[in-house]
Amino acid sequence: MDLHRTPLHDLCVTTGGRMVPFAGWEMPVQFSGLVAEHTAVRQRVGLFDISHMGVLRIEGSNPKDALQTLVPTDLHRIGPGQACYSVLLNESGGIRDDLIVYDLGQTNSDQGEASLIVVINAACAAADTAWISEQLTPQGLKVTDEKGDGILLALQGPEALARMEQLSGVDLHALPRFAHRMLDLTGLSRPVFCARTGYTGEDGVELLLAREDGRNLWNRLVADGVTPCGLGARDTLRLEAAMHLYGQDMDADTTPFEAGLGWLVHLEMPSTFTGRAALERAADSGPSRRLVGLKLKGRAIARHGYPVIHNGEQAGAITSGSWSPTLQEAIALAYVPTALAKVGQELGVEIRGQVQAATVVRRPFYRHP
C-alpha cells in the first residue's frame, strides 16, 4: 500500500529524519536521536510535524448541540476561543477515538452559523470523518476537511511560548491552557490557528498553517535552533505524561471508566449521546479492570501485550511501555483487575520468559514544573 506523505516530508528528510510507516503515513521516527529529542522538549523546545492528524470543521446553526450527540463530555462548558478533550463512543460505550474540540464561535453572522474544529487521530481519520458526517449531515451540519494540503505543527517545551511570542508580538502566556486564537506571524502570508495544547506533557502550542507558510515556519524554527523531533520522542514524552495512545491504551472495547477517563463522562447533563445507556450501566456496576501506571525494577522494557503477573498467573496486559529518559526508569501502562489497581500493589511483568517485578504508581509518571 502506498503511504501518504505530509507537505513537510522532503524537509524532514533533508533535516535528517529517519522515515518509517505509521498509520498509513511515512513519518520521521527520529532526527538527531530519541533521547536527545526527548530531552530537548523537556528542557528547551522541540518541533513536531503532526500533519498526519485529521482536522475537521463542523459548521452550521448548532454544531455544538449536534456534536454533543456523539461525545459524553458537556461541550457547553466551553465557549468561543476554548477547547476540550473528549472521546467518540460506540453504542457499547467503547472508545472509537479520542479528539480535541475547538469552539470557533460564530463564523457567519449573516447565516447565524457557528463552527467547531475537531482534531482526530491519523489511524482513525477516514472512519471518523465518514461516521461524523453520516451522523451530523442529516442534522443540517456541514462537515469538511479543514486541513486540506495544509500543515499541522506542534511546538513543545518550556521555551515554546517565548519562541512564538518573538514571531507574533503576542503575550501567549496570557492564553489559558486549551485556549486558542488566530496569530499573525512575521513573514507568513496569512493568520495561523494557534492552540495552547499538546501531547508531550509540556507547555506549548499546536499550529494549523497553509502549506507554504508551514514549510516557511519549519525552516525558520529549525534554522533558529529548535530541535526537530520524531514519533519516537513523541511516544516517550506522552507516556511519561501518561497520555493515552489510541489503539494501544484504549480501543473500541474499552470504556472511559476502564481507561481512567471517567472525568470525560458527564452523565449529569440531559443530552442523549451515543453509548450513554451503556455508560450509565457501567457507572452503576463499576469497571472490572482499570488502566494503571507501572514502574519496573531493572532496565528491562515492558512492551505492548506483555503479560502482567500476579500470584504466578496472568492478571492483565501491558498496553504501552518504555524506558523513561527523564526518570531513568522503566515505565508502562497496563490493564489489571480493579482489585489490583491500588497504588503500591506489587505485580510482575513477563519479559522474554522472565518475570520482572513492578509496582503500581500514581499517574502521570512525570508532571512538568
Curated annotation (Swiss-Prot):
Q: Which UniProt keywords apply?
A: Aminotransferase, Transferase
Q: What InterPro entries does the annotation carry?
A: GCS_T, GCS_T_bac, GCST_C, GCV_T_N, GcvT/YgfZ/DmdA, GcvT/YgfZ_C, TrmE/GcvT_dom1
**Any one Pfam family match given in the protein's UniProt record, by short name:** GCV_T
**Statement: the UniProt record of this protein carries the keyword DNA damage:** no
Q: Which cysteines are joined by disulfide bonds?
A: none
What EC designation does it have? 2.1.2.10
Top EC class, one word: transferase
**What GO cellular component term, any one, is given?**
cytosol
Quote one Gene Ontology molecular function term.
aminomethyltransferase activity
Q: Which SUPFAM superfamilies match?
A: Aminomethyltransferase beta-barrel domain, Folate-binding domain
Listed under catalytic activity are: N(6)-[(R)-S(8)-aminomethyldihydrolipoyl]-L-lysyl-[protein] + (6S)-5,6,7,8-tetrahydrofolate = N(6)-[(R)-dihydrolipoyl]-L-lysyl-[protein] + (6R)-5,10-methylene-5,6,7,8-tetrahydrofolate + NH4(+)
Q: Which GO terms describe its biological process?
A: glycine decarboxylation via glycine cleavage system
Is the keyword Nucleotide-binding assigned to this protein? no
Assembly and interactions? The glycine cleavage system is composed of four proteins: P, T, L and H.
Q: Which family does it belong to?
A: Belongs to the GcvT family.
Q: What does this protein do?
A: The glycine cleavage system catalyzes the degradation of glycine.
What is the official name of this protein in its record?
Aminomethyltransferase
Taxonomy, top ranks, is:
Bacteria, Bacillati, Cyanobacteriota, Cyanophyceae, Synechococcales
